[in-house]
Amino acid sequence: CHSLKYDKLFSNKNTVCYVILVWALTVLAIVPNWFVESLQYDPRVFSCTFAQSVSSLYTIMVVVVHFIVPIGIVTYCYLRIWILVIQVPRRVKPDSRPKIKPHDFRNFLTMFVVFVLFAVCWAPLNFIGLAVAIHPRLGQSIPEWLFTASYF
């Protein structure tokens, strides 16, 4: 059972608007690459990809906006959820023991695993990019295998 707000928030019309918003934000995130000319072919990964050495300031902004801020927001939200889960048994009367439903816990755990996988997969590439942006000479000292592995 979910709240009455759910039907209003996720109506067919609103869902279409959310999808359009996601695509608009995606295009908005890509457009600056054309002006900075940061999309270049990289023979190490055999692909056209974001060149971290084109503009240090731009690379730092990309890492902050597309990785650090989302990780920070999601971490904050998960901490709030865990704090709430820990505090709920203390707020409820001792004789009535609320139990977390198995499907609620499974859903929470699934979303947490998705978050951890996002962080684990994107952290190496973003931290290498941030290191190269802050110290450009460091780019030559990063082993090619490490750079290539960060893409996979």
Swiss-Prot record:
Gene3D superfamilies: Rhodopsin 7-helix transmembrane proteins. Keywords: Biological rhythms, Cell membrane, G-protein coupled receptor, Membrane, Receptor, Transducer, Transmembrane, Transmembrane helix. Residues 1-13, 80-111 are cytoplasmic. Induction: By cocaine, which increases the levels of day-time expression. It is found in: Cell membrane. GO terms for cellular component: plasma membrane. Disulfide bonds: none annotated. It is a multi-pass membrane protein. Pfam families: 7tm_1. Its main location: membrane. The chain crosses the membrane at residues 14-34, 59-79, 112-132, 145-152. GO terms for molecular function: melatonin receptor activity. Belongs to the G-protein coupled receptor 1 family. High affinity receptor for melatonin. The activity of this receptor is mediated by pertussis toxin sensitive G proteins that inhibits adenylate cyclase activity. This is Melatonin receptor type 1A-like. The gene is mtnr1al.
